[in-house]
Swiss-Prot record:
The gene is ITGAX. It is found in: Membrane. This is Integrin alpha-X. CDD domains: vWA_integrins_alpha_subunit. It comes from Homo sapiens. Ca(2+) 3 binds at D593, D597, D601. One of its GO terms (biological process) is positive regulation of gene expression.
Length: 1163
């Protein structure tokens, strides 16, 4: 048994552990070569780590062992206990518990094997130890074997088929069986049967007899037939009756011995066996002789015996062989003791396994008894000098079978009143935790909470936590180590202790890291104490299955509420400490100072070893920062030119105050730390306005080794003589890190900075203000603006709105001067153009941003004079440009309001606010055009003057703008000239919307000389003709919408003779109109609002073609006769005839078989 100290000196390990409360650099490992060492662990008497080794084999039939391990000696020694010989294989050390007031240790072995007949029971045994000796053994005495009362009847065959010798042998067998059982738990009765029945003694007579075996002396054979069924009926109705001494709660057993099948009996077995079953009689049938080799005889034994028959039948070849089965019969009868009866309580605690869990309470130790009452479970409370009290759910009428109540036990206190919390991880396969409290000296269930996942083992571990250390339990942690998720295994529920008799619920759940689905997070829980110095209790949770059973432990801090932080502050993996560790975190114990440094320690059990981890002392750092002088004088930063000419010196004084935050026994001189100071001027600014004299730049670093005292240092700052921004104070930022120095006297224990300690500090160095003798700046601001060159705003055409703004200050210097514009949402700020300035030392910069104000669609644009002072007597002019949304809705007038304010908090005046209105119209782009499909040309003759022809004009109307609007489409059609109809029955149609209605009205012709006008310009329109005007109103002409209109009527020809023209153009006109007070056509696009369509009308003359046809025909005939005569004269017709004849002769000759010679060719 040796002690191993592991010093992890690697830089990476050191770096990762600096911010953690549990020290992993210097730890103590206790190793013992005993099976199960580390399965349980408990801190004891602020000096020892007590470790259980429940699997250790100490001697024959003895298992388990205890060890006490000391930090100072680094060794483990066995704790010698006088284990009684009856504590067979008890697994001592499987559960451990301790208390400090007074110092007591409870070590339990819950697997004491107790043999009763053929049954092996599991009870428990615990040892209560004081600082020097064993004080008590729990339970005080060994549990005796349960005594089940048994009433046994022998029903023996006395028929004539049995010889007197065999009858005597059978009686000896009966005598031997009776002698194997003890009174008073077992009593016998004897009846002999043939065709007669004789009761030799009853249970009552057996109980009264001083020598029961003497009752067998008067038994003589009856002789006769074999009435077995009737005999069984007599036994059921008579011997197993209370009047014959039968006991109500005793097991009823009937042993029938016969040499053959029943004979002459009027009853059948089916008549009597159901009676025996209803009475709960267990029947054994013993068949003697060769008769039972017959199938029918064997069936009788099956009918007599209880089921299963093979367990209740004995068959021997002769009576001499009965002695061979007497032990078998005995064992079978003994085995009946393990069966349950309706009211028996003898077997309720035979598998109790007391001490499976243990906890100390003010009233005495409590031992979990998970196996009691068919593994329903419960717990025993052992008050001093009093009988134990059994606590379970029997009074709650709840089915708790196989729940393992008492698997874990914990004490809860609320204002001095104690409650007991028991875990039942197998309750309905999901688990449960139950709170018991005393009511009228009876332990009753107060509240319960159940698990949510089958197999999660909710309630396998419990931990009572007093977060705020006020002496009352605030919450109970309930582990469910087998809770399964895809990426992590196990969880711990945080359940506030219910007040009064309210429902118990859990308001949070703690988890381990992801990636460990078999981690068993929550297998072990312990209270560690306040390790980070915030005066709130912290807890540790074990996860022994993580990283392939290497294990890990998690530290969770307490938080106000009170509750537990949902995220862990530290995780220690077993592989981080040693590659050989297995099941690290399977047992935990914390809260005591074993290393004598005033800090609580943590003992962690693993396979074959226990590791002792110390907590580190926690430090707190306070900081103060001052400047000398407290503000920068004006002479140091005011200048009229942007030239750095000289520098001013300012001194900064920084003090650090280091103190202990956690209570410990370490001296002030012992605790030292390496502190790194990182200083920066104007962090976040592109260029600093000051530098350190030491480094000539904006940053500086120093490293100091400091103890628990105040430490101050001075730093000189240099400032340029011309500062661009003298409004915003110069910022000095301090960032420090603290690394504790190892304490050699305490095995290199390192202090640490509190995790929630502030590490960043800032101080501001302001600039002196020019505010007069009273140091209160009273500015006098004013503002006005105009819209240069703009009389009205045309939305959709004017994409920008320019406001020329003038701001002035007639008072003292103004700081943080801001100009705020209030405008509709249709306007959005774009940019400002800086203009003229008067009275300012340096240039001005304006920075603007916009934001909505309220829910009325109003926006606010603020422009800050950045970051300078707006001097008294100064005046600036700038141009603010706003984008105007083409779809903006601004009403008929735009109101723009401007306000000027400052950080001087000077009361507002009429000059600080200015507003101006601007008329608003909305630009539209509507177009009307003539459609290409219309009647372009018509002609007629004089004979058709009284007729007419259908004419059609078509127009297309489009909204090409970005806004819907109501419009009217007007059409002018000439219908009358000098009281004569021109265009008749004219109608307007709109195919896309037949429901659109158009109105019409006649317009009289102007009083003018139409004939003179049309002679100059042969065009008929409404300037000279009477017209019909159509008006079609469109309530909403949508964006990109297209409308088609058709004018159709009968165009007459008769009126044309008035104008003395053969060709004239008939013109219709279409025009778009709208409300010009609201809308305006885009500039330059007005011509597209009007269009016309023209149809040309022409008159023609009709000519007579007869003379021309007759003259042409006669002339043609005369010409043909002349040509024929000429051809005849030249012999044209004769030559042709001769050639035709010769060709005909040439074709006939070959047919007659002779060849006609060719005429000689002419030469």
């Amino acid at each position: 048994m040796t002690r191993t100290r592991a010093a992890l000196l690697l830089f990476t390990a050191l770096a990762t552990s600096l911010g953690f409360n549990l020290d992993t650099e210097e730890l103590t490992a206790f190793r013992v070569d005993s099976a199960g060492f580390g399965d349980s662990v408990v801190q004891y008497a602020n000096s020892w780590v007590v470790v259980g080794a429940p699997q250790k084999i100490t001697a024959a039939n003895q298992t388990g062992g205890l060890y006490q391990c000391g930090y100072s000696t680094g060794a483990c020694e066995p704790i010698g206990l006088q284990v009684p010989p009856e504590a067979v294989n008890m697994s001592l050390g499987l559960s451990l518990a301790s208390t400090t007031s007074p110092s007591q240790l409870l070590a339990c072995g819950p697997t004491v094997h107790h043999e009763c007949g053929r049954n092996m029971y599991l009870t428990g045994l615990c040892f209560l130890l004081g600082p020097t000796q064993l004080t008590q053994r729990l339970p005080v005495s060994r549990q005796e074997c349960p005594r089940q009362e048994q009433d046994i009847v022998f029903l023996i065959d006395g028929s004539g088929s049995i010889s007197s010798r065999n009858f005597a042998t059978m009686m000896n067998f009966v005598r031997a069986v009776i002698s194997q059982f003890q009174r008073p738990s077992t009593q016998f009765s004897l009846m002999q049967f043939s065709n007669k029945f004789q009761t030799h003694f009853t249970f009552e007579e057996f109980r009264r007899s001083s020598n029961p075996l003497s009752l067998l002396a008067s038994v003589h054979q009856l002789q006769g037939f074999t009435y077995t069924a009737t005999a069984i009926q007599n036994v059921v109705h008579r011997l197993f009756h209370a009047s014959y001494g039968a006991r109500r709660d005793a097991a009823k057993i009937l042993i029938v011995i016969t040499d053959g099948k029943k004979e002459g009996d009027s009853l059948d077995y089916k008549d009597v066996i159901p009676m025996a079953d209803a009475a709960g009689i267990i029947r054994y049938a013993i068949g003697v002789g060769l008769a039972f080799q017959n199938r029918n005889s064997w069936k009788e034994l099956n009918d007599i015996a209880s089921k299963p028959s093979q367990e209740h039948i004995f068959k021997v070849e002769d009576f001499d062989a009965l002695k061979d089965i007497q032990n078998q019969l005995k064992e079978k009868i003994f085995a009946i003791e393990g069966t349950e009866t309706t009211s028996s309580s003898s077997f309720e605690l035979e598998m109790a396994q007391e001490g499976f869990s243990a906890v100390f309470t003010p009233d005495g130790p409590v031992l979990g008894a998970v196996g009691s009452f068919t593994w329903s479970g419960g717990a025993f409370l052992y008050p001093p000098n009093m009988s134990p009290t059994f606590i379970n759910m029997s009074q709650e009428n709840v089915d708790m079978r196989d729940s393992y109540l008492g698997y874990s036990t914990e004490l809860a206190l609320w204002k001095g009143v104690q409650s007991l919390v028991l875990g039942a991880p197998r309750y309905q396969h999901t688990g449960k935790a139950v709170i018991f409290t005393q009511v009228s000296r009876q332990w009753r269930m107060k509240a319960e909470v159940t698990g949510t996942q089958i197999g999660s083992y909710f309630g396998a571990s419990l931990c009572s936590v007093d977060v705020d250390s006020d002496g009352s339990t605030d919450l109970v942690l309930i582990g469910a180590p087998h809770y399964y998720e895809q990426t992590r295994g196990g969880q711990v529920s945080v359940c506030p202790l219910p007040r009064g008799w309210r429902r118990w619920w859990c308001d949070a759940v703690l988890y381990g890291e992801q990636g460990h689905p078999w981690g068993r997070f929550g297998a072990a829980l312990t209270v560690l104490g306040d390790v980070n110095g915030d005066k709130l209790t912290d807890v540790v949770i074990g996860a022994p299955g993580e990283e392939e059973n290497r294990g890990a432990v998690y530290l969770f801090h307490g938080v106000l509420g009170p509750s537990i932080s949902p995220s862990h502050s530290q995780r220690i993996a077993g592989s981080q400490l040693s590659s050989r560790l297995q099941y690290f975190g399977q047992a935990l114990s914390g809260g005591q100072d074993l290393t004598q440094d005033g800090l609580v320690d943590l003992a962690v059990g693993a396979r074959g070893q226990v590791l002792l981890l110390r907590t580190r002392p926690v430090l707190w750092v306070g900081v103060s920062m001052q400047f000398i002088p407290a503000e920068i004088p004006r002479s140091a930063f005011e200048c009229r030119e942007q030239v750095v000419s000289e520098q001013t010196l300012v001194q900064s004084n920084i003090c650090l105050y280091i103190d202990k935050r956690s209570k410990n026994l370490l001296g002030s001189r012992d605790l030292q730390s390496s502190v790194t100071l990182d200083l920066a001027l104007d962090p976040g600014r592109l260029s600093p306005r000051a530098t350190f004299q030491e480094t000539k730049n904006r940053s500086l670093s120093r490293v100091r080794v400091l103890g628990l005292k105040a430490h101050c240092e001075n730093f000189n700052l240099l400032l340029p003589s011309c500062v661009e921004d003298s409004v915003t104070p110069i910022t000095l930022r301090l960032n420090f890190t603290l690394v504790g120095k190892p304490l050699l006297a305490f095995r290199n224990l390192r202090p640490m900075l509190a995790a929630d300690a502030q590490r960043y500090f800032t101080a501001s160095l302001p600039f002196e203000k020019n505010c007069g003798a009273d140091h209160i700046c009273q500015d006098n601001l004013g503002i006005s603006f105009s819209f240069p060159g703009l009389k009205s705003l045309l939305v959709g055409s004017n994409l920008e709105l320019n406001a020329e703004v003038m701001v002035w200050n007639d008072g003292e210097d103004s700081y943080g001067t801001t100009i705020t514009f209030s405008h509709p949402a249709g306007l959005s700020y774009r940019y400002v153009a800086e203009g003229q300035k008067q009275g300012q030392l340096r240039s001005l910069h304006l920075t603007c941003d916009s934001a909505p104000v309220g829910s009325q669609g109003t926006w606010s644009t603020s422009c800050r004079i950045n970051h300078l002072i707006f001097r008294g007597g100064a005046q600036i002019t700038f141009l603010a440009t706003f984008d105007v949304s083409p779809k903006a809705v601004l009403g008929d007038r735009l109101l723009l309001t401007a306000n000027v304010s400052s950080e001087n908090n000077t009361p507002r005046t009429s000059k600080t606010t200015f507003q101006l209105e601007l008329p608003v119209k909305y630009a539209v782009y509507t177009v009307v055009s003539s459609h290409e499909q219309f009647t372009k040309y018509l002609n007629f003759s004089e004979s058709e003057e009284k007729e007419s022809h259908v004419a059609m004009h078509r127009y297309q109307v489009n909204n090409l703008g970005q806004r819907d609007l109501p419009v009217s489409i007007n059409f002018w059609v000439p219908v009358e000239l000098n009281q004569e109809a021109v265009w008749m029955d004219v109608e307007v149609s709109h195919p896309q919307n037949p429901s659109l209605r158009c109105s019409s009205e006649k317009i009289a012709p102007p009083a003018s000389d139409f004939l003179a006008h049309i002679q100059k310009n042969p065009v008929l329109d409404c300037s000279i003709a009477g017209c019909l005007r159509f008006r079609c109103d469109v309530p909403s002409f949508s964006v990109q919408e297209e409308l088609d209109f058709t004018l159709k009527g009968n165009l007459s020809f008769g009126w044309v003779r008035q104008i003395l023209q053969k060709k004239v153009s008939v013109v219709s006109v279409a025009e778009i109109t709208f409300d010009t007070s609201v809308y305006s056509q885009l500039p330059g696009q007005e011509a597209f609002m009007r269009a016309q369509t023209t149809t040309v009308l022409e008159k023609y003359k009709v000519h007579n073609p007869t003379p021309l046809i007759v003259g042409s025909s006669i002339g043609g005939l005369l010409l043909l006769a002349l040509i024929t005569a000429v051809l005849y004269k030249v012999g044209f017709f004769k030559r042709q005839y001769k050639e035709m004849m010769e060709e005909a002769n040439g074709q006939i000759a070959p047919e007659n078989g002779t060849q006609t010679p060719s005429p000689p060719s002419e030469k």
